[in-house]
């Protein structure tokens, strides 16, 4: 079950309401970034892409698959895309009057595969996504790379973000209130897990 994260969800929903939100979410592994994102997008028109260490061509192919499933256009998965801008254009053109969320999870993997990806994304945001009812969410566990390529002054994406969330372990009060535990049991569990959601699963 989803626990806590009230302020983070409020931030994401506020960004959805603005003209063009660009949110960067980062934090250590297993702290619940993907769970937070999936809770946020569950009732929204969203394109969710999880990057991996695969080749750029494979990433584009899978991204096209995400577009195909979300737009219910099977032809998109049959097209061989060679330009990220064309893929992002599909997102922009989908339901132009409806707010959409585009999530790129584990964004640093795309940068590792193609160091120019931040520049490509900057161009896509400025030219294709920003004025087309799209909220962009970049997420990653490699904190140093997220800071360097999404937040730093010398990153092509600098100045684009409208919000950033460094996701921390859950607060004790959230853990205690969400579970049917005595206070002593909750303290013991929190001492062992540190409020890291993935570790808390072992107690379910």
Where are the model-predicted features located?
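Phosphate-binding site recognition
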Residues: 1-204
């Amino acid at each position: 079950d989803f626990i806590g994260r009230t302020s983070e969800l409020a931030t994401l929903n506020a960004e959805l309401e603005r003209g063009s939100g660009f949110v960067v979410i980062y934090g250590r592994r297993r702290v619940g970034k993907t769970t937070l994102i999936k809770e946020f997008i569950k009732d929204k028109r969203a394109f969710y892409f999880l990057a991996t260490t695969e080749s750029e061509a494979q990433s584009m192919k899978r991204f096209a698959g995400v577009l195909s499933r979300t737009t219910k256009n099977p032809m998109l998965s049959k097209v061989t895309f060679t330009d990220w801008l064309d893929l992002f254009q599909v997102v922009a053109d989908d339901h132009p009057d409806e707010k959409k969320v585009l999530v790129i999870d584990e964004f640093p993997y795309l940068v590792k595969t193609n160091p120019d990806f931040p520049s490509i994304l900057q161009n896509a945001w400025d030219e294709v996504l920003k004025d087309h009812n799209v909220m962009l969410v970049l997420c990653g566990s490699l904190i140093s790379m997220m800071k360097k390529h999404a937040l730093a002054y010398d990153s092509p994406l600098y100045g684009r973000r409208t919000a950033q969330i460094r996701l921390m372990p859950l607060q004790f009060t959230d853990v205690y209130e969400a579970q049917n535990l005595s206070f002593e049991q909750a303290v013991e569990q929190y001492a062992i897990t540190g409020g890291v959601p993935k570790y808390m699963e072992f107690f379910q």
